């Protein structure tokens, strides 16, 4: 757990009168704990508390190989995960809730909580902290940008050959990033030739580059993220 970052979030909570904060966004949980998890449809929650008694709720199918320095509550698919969260909030007054948390979990927690408990949108507590980058983060962002420049140069050269389709070029992007020290794509890359190439979220096809075509490339690499 990154205690310095957690303390900043706790300060934000205190300023807004929240005694607990439910965080469900995996990237925010990773930012605060260093634990990277992709839960899919299963409930995954970090519950921060002003008293320092923090708890993470994990499905028993998740893999954990590090000491997170907090309480861990494990549940199975056959168990009522949100009820476990509600139990941890039985004495809560004001609970901040992640803007990305699914209603199917939140509604169950609200149903089981005490009548005096108030739920508020609480993501701003984490968002404010993440907006202000630490020096190490700035260094990583600069390096990620440098690597992306090198990667896109290679992609431009692939496109310039003229014998590769949009899909064929797109499929090589992840390998290019990995060769430069990145873990892969940060999102699905877009390579678009010619007319309508600037359409939002274009999906590549078997189009080949023709003389006079414009080329749209939208790509990014994941570097120590």
What are these regions (language model features)?
Residues 44, 110, 155-156, 163, ...:
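Residue-level detector of alpha-helical recognition elements and their boundaries
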Residues 29-39, 125-126, 132, 164-225:
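Short catalytic-site patches enriched in acidic/histidine residues
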Residues 1-150:
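A composition/biophysics-driven feature that prefers long, compositionally simple stretches
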């Amino acid at each position: 757990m990154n205690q310095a970052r957690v303390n900043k979030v706790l300060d934000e909570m205190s300023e807004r009168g929240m005694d607990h904060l439910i965080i469900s966004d995996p990237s925010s949980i990773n930012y605060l704990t260093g634990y990277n998890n992709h839960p899919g449809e299963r409930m995954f929650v970090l519950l921060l508390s002003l008293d320092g008694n923090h708890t993470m709720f994990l499905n028993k199918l998740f893999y954990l190989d590090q000491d997170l320095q907090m309480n861990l509550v494990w549940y199975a698919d056959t168990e009522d995960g949100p009820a476990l969260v509600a139990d941890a909030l039985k004495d809560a007054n004001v609970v901040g809730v992640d803007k990305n948390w699914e209603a199917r979990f939140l509604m169950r927690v609200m149903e089981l909580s005490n009548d005096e408990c108030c739920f508020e949108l609480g993501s701003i507590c984490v968002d404010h902290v993440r907006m202000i980058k630490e020096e190490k983060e700035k260094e990583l962002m600069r390096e990620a940008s440098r690597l992306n420049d090198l990667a896109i140069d290679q992609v431009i050269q692939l496109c310039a050959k003229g014998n590769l389709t949009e899909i064929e070029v797109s499929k090589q992007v992840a390998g290019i990033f990995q060769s430069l020290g990145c873990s892969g794509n940060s999102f699905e890359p877009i390579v678009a030739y010619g007319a309508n190439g600037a359409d939002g979220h274009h999906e590549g096809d078997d189009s080949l580059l023709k003389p006079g075509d414009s080329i749209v490339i939208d790509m990014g690499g994941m570097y120590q993220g």
